[in-house]
Amino acid sequence: MQAEELYVALNSSEATEAGLDLMFNGDSNGSGGFADASLNGTSKIIGSKTAASTLAGSATTKAKFDNMIIDFATNVVPNWGSDAGVGQAGAISSPDGASTYHINAQGQEIDQLFFKGLIGAFTLDQIVNNYIHPNQLDSGSRIDDNDNDVLSGDNNYTDMEHKWDEGFGYLLSLIHI
């Protein structure tokens, strides 16, 4: 899954801005930069679905994710082997020494901010503002078609059922992250 590979990359001292950006935003060929070749060249691009609704603030939100990629690649990665300090990116250990965290100069662990931010900017935005929004569910003849069990093409579901299934698919995908 693309998100899993991007998470691994945001925990790697080998990550580059170009590589992370390709995984998040894709390029003219679609998705790219993933070790699993089946994830490359698709129209499924994490960045294109992040803060993708037309609500005010969406562009600002998307830019925050792009800036986190830049921060990680230009500040965290170069200081991977250094100890973090006040105003200094680097590594910090848990109190018991069992875990090491790589933080930016503000003490933020970018991978955690990035992926917890995606819960809202990607998952919630897709569910609420795209799939189960009244503009989707109530558009055209969907209400009547659903009430009268009019199936979508050759499928065994109505258009409205499909929108609900897509929305919950985004929610349940969080189980794998």
For the regions a protein language model found, what residue spans apply to each?
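Mature extracytoplasmic or organellar-lumen-exposed domains after removal of signal/transit peptides
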Residues: 1-175
